[in-house]
Swiss-Prot record:
Role noted for this protein: Calcium-dependent mitochondrial carrier protein that catalyzes the import of ATP co-transported with metal divalent cations across the mitochondrial inner membrane in exchange for phosphate (Pi). Can transport phosphate, AMP, ADP, ATP, adenosine 5'-phosphosulfate, sulfate and thiosulfate, and, to a lesser extent, other nucleotides. Binds calcium ions Ca(2+). Also mediates calcium uptake.
Protein name: Calcium-dependent mitochondrial ATP-magnesium/phosphate carrier protein 3
Entry's localization field: Mitochondrion inner membrane
Originating organism: Arabidopsis thaliana
CDD domains recorded: EFh_PI-PLC
GO molecular function, one term: calcium ion transmembrane transporter activity
Residues annotated as domain EF-hand: 33-68, 69-104, 105-135, 136-171
Gene: APC3
Length: 479
């Protein structure tokens, strides 16, 4: 935004006291006129003249208002209005909701309207959003104002503000108002860097990125034994059970053997997250249209390309990690990292650090596509059959994310096995040769070695990531 925008104000400072008289004055209506307006709105929903509203009437009324799906909260609105929980909303309950909501909306309207001229100017809205931790550019601000400003005069009156949010049953904070269509689901199962949703519009994006990175590091460390077990099983040609492999790892290195390679796995988080985020932000305007909205397919494309770039950049670390996890201990000791890296460079050349990159990149877009499709489907199913049209909360979203992530990982798992075997093999085996060797020697079963520990780590990895991320946000004052 231009430097002429007002500075050093506190637009979120609350007025001393807000009464219904303030609301009437702002709306330029009398108490009787307001009563008629509220009664008309109630009658609009009560089109059967029952004298009360049920959930079906509220849902039907919202649908006839042509409110976009992301703004529909029929179940929540019904629950908030039904104060005595008798399954129906009478006029007095409906009126009490409207009274409380209009007072709440006027309170935040006054907090944004620092000039106190009865309307919100774009620069006032911009400053309030920034104070709330939301950073938007001129085009996004113009679209936001245009959405609320019904008479298109460039400012927002309280009447327009009220009409936009009157049927929004949740707390009307600025962050809720701007982000209530966004859903956060942070899932890290140790395969690729996770970028927190909504981060690109947050002024403290670097701190959010740090919080996500630290959460991923803690999660990967906690699930490192399962990761080591998975990799060891993936490279074994002969059938080997989980328990014999666990005993083998214990015999070689005792407890620390289960954490071999975890240091590199954690070190990958920061550069991979940073590269993926920066690449994603650069690709968005190239893929998006004039309105800046890239849509679901655009997000999938931009995310896939950003993920491929990040994966390529940190791939040598991933290969060395695999070699470290799969090589045999010498004299009961794990090989030194620097010696292992040097041996690869000297014996196999620099190209060896990119063995298995192609199958790794091949799996990125299918994994993301399956993950996204499954997540949205599960969320819709939970909304329909479990929550009765209420928006799913963090726990449901986390469960949907874990399930979709596990499904996506399972579908592309054969590519992951081929990649791991190519990484661990010092010979110049191509992807096609590795596929043929596995199919010929082990059949389809060979492509799913290590799948069990991979799936077992999904729940703890995702849960730990989510808990640590939320705790970090709280400690960094990012909520």
């Amino acid at each position: 935004m231009e430097s002429s925008k007002p500075k050093n104000r506190n637009p979120m400072k609350k007025p001393v006291s807000i009464t219904m008289e303030h609301v009437l004055l702002a709306l330029r209506e009398t108490m009787d006129e307001r009563e008629i307006r509220i009664r008309s709105l109630f009658d609009f929903f009560d089109n059967s003249n029952l004298g009360f509203l049920d959930y079906a009437q509220i849902e039907k009324g919202l649908a006839s208002l042509q409110i976009p799906p992301e703004y529909k909260y029929a179940r929540d609105l019904f629950r908030v209005c039904d104060a005595n929980r008798d399954g129906r909303v009478d006029y007095q309950e409906f009126r009490r909701y409207i009274d409380a909501k209009e007072l709440e909306l006027y309170r935040i309207f006054q907090a944004i309207d620092v000039e106190h001229n009865g309307c919100i100017l774009p620069e006032e809205l911009w400053e309030a959003l920034v104070k709330a931790g939301i950073e938007i550019d001129d085009e996004e601000l113009a679209r936001f104002v245009e959405h609320v400003d019904k008479d298109n005069n460039g400012t927002i009156t309280f009447e327009e503000w009220r009409d936009f949010l009157l049927l929004y049953p949740h707390e009307a904070t600025l962050e809720n108002i701007y982000h209530h269509w966004e859903r956060v689901c942070l899932i890290d199962i140790g395969e690729q860097a996770v970028i927190p949703d909504g981060i690109s519009k947050h002024v403290k994006r670097s701190r959010l990125l740090l919080a996500g990175g630290l959460a991923g590091a803690v999660s990967r460390t906690a699930t490192a034994p399962l990761d080591r077990l998975k990799v060891v099983l993936q490279v074994q040609r002969a059938h080997a059970g989980v328990l014999p492999t666990i005993k083998k790892i214990w015999r070689e290195d005792k407890l620390m053997g289960f954490f071999r390679g975890n240091g590199l796995n954690v070190m990958k988080v920061a550069p991979e997250s940073a590269i993926k985020f920066c690449a994603y932000e650069m690709l968005k305007p190239m893929i998006g249209g004039e309105d800046g909205d890239i849509g679901t397919s655009g997000r999938l494309m931009a995310g896939g390309m950003a993920g491929a770039l990040a994966q390529t950049a940190i791939y040598p670390m991933d290969l060395v990690k695999t070699r470290l996890q799969t090589c045999v201990s010498e004299g009961g000791k794990a090989p030194k990292l620097w010696k292992l890296t040097k041996d690869i460079w000297v014996r196999e050349g620099p190209r060896a650090f990119y063995k298995g990159l192609f199958p790794s990149l091949l799996g990125i877009v299918p994994y993301a596509g399956i993950d996204l499709a499954a997540y949205e489907t599960l969320k819709d199913l939970s909304r329909t059959y479990i929550l009765q049209d209420t928006e799913p909360g963090p726990l449901i979203q986390l469960s949907c994310g874990m399930t979709s992530g596990a499904l996506g990982a399972s579908c592309v798992y054969p590519l992951q096995v081929v990649r791991t075997r190519m990484q661990a093999d010092s010979s110049k085996t191509t992807m096609k040769q590795e596929f043929m060797n596995t199919m010929k020697g082990e059949g389809l079963r060979g492509f799913y070695r290590g799948l069990l520990p991979n799936l077992l780590k999904v729940v703890p990895a995702a849960s730990i990531t989510y808990i640590v991320y939320e705790a970090m946000k709280k400690n960094m004052a990012l909520d």
